[in-house]
């Protein structure tokens, strides 16, 4: 398989499939896909404050409630997770329990995107 063929295959992936690919590559090769951040020299007094503002990088998307539109929420869960109908239904019915994790270890951007999709379907979602 040539590099061009690999790129073509990657172009056909969905956002959730790309996120899964990145996660697997990070695990396989022990690297991170996070963009390097340029850090300016901070004054000594500001260094302690900067450490306190460290932001969480991995989030779990937890379903708190499926609301009034359970069927639509199940469809969105299937789209996000790739689960079958029964598995997605079982997951949605766990709403409110600690086991109702739709996706774990995702970036803030992906977690927000998943939350938005689920809320549009009528679900109540929490990011942990």
From Swiss-Prot:
Pfam family, one: Ribosomal_L12_N
Protein name: Large ribosomal subunit protein bL12
Keyword flag Transcription: no
MF terms in GO: mRNA binding; structural constituent of ribosome
CDD domains: Ribosomal_L7_L12
GO biological process, one term: translation
InterPro entries assigned: Ribosomal_bL12 (IPR000206), Ribosomal_bL12_C (IPR013823), Ribosomal_bL12_C/ClpS-like (IPR014719), Ribosomal_bL12_oligo (IPR008932), Ribosomal_bL12_oligo_N_sf (IPR036235)
GO cellular component: cytosolic large ribosomal subunit
General function of this protein: Forms part of the ribosomal stalk which helps the ribosome interact with GTP-bound translation factors. Is thus essential for accurate translation.
PANTHER family: 39S RIBOSOMAL PROTEIN L12, LARGE RIBOSOMAL SUBUNIT PROTEIN BL12M
Gene3D superfamilies, A to Z: 3.30.1390.10, Single helix bin
Keywords: Ribonucleoprotein, Ribosomal protein
Similarity-based family: Belongs to the bacterial ribosomal protein bL12 family.
Gene name in the database record: rplL
Summary of subunit composition and partner proteins: Homodimer. Part of the 50S ribosomal subunit; present in 6 copies per ribosome. Forms part of the ribosomal stalk which helps the ribosome interact with GTP-bound translation factors. Forms a heptameric L10(L12)2(L12)2(L12)2 complex, where L10 forms an elongated spine to which 3 L12 dimers bind in a sequential fashion.
């Amino acid at each position: 398989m040539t590099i061009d063929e690999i790129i073509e295959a990657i172009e056909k992936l969905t956002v959730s499939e790309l996120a899964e690919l990145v996660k697997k590559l990070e695990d396989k090769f022990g690297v991170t896909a996070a963009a390097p951040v340029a850090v300016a020299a901070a004054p000594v007094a500001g260094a302690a404050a900067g450490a306190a503002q460290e932001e969480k990088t991995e989030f779990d998307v937890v379903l708190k409630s499926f609301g009034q539109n359970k069927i639509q929420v199940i469809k969105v869960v299937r789209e996000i997770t790739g689960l079958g109908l029964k598995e997605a239904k079982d997951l949605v019915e766990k709403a409110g329990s600690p086991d109702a994790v739709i996706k774990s270890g995702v970036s803030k951007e992906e977690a927000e995107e998943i939350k938005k999709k689920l809320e549009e379907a009528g679900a109540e979602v929490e990011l942990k």
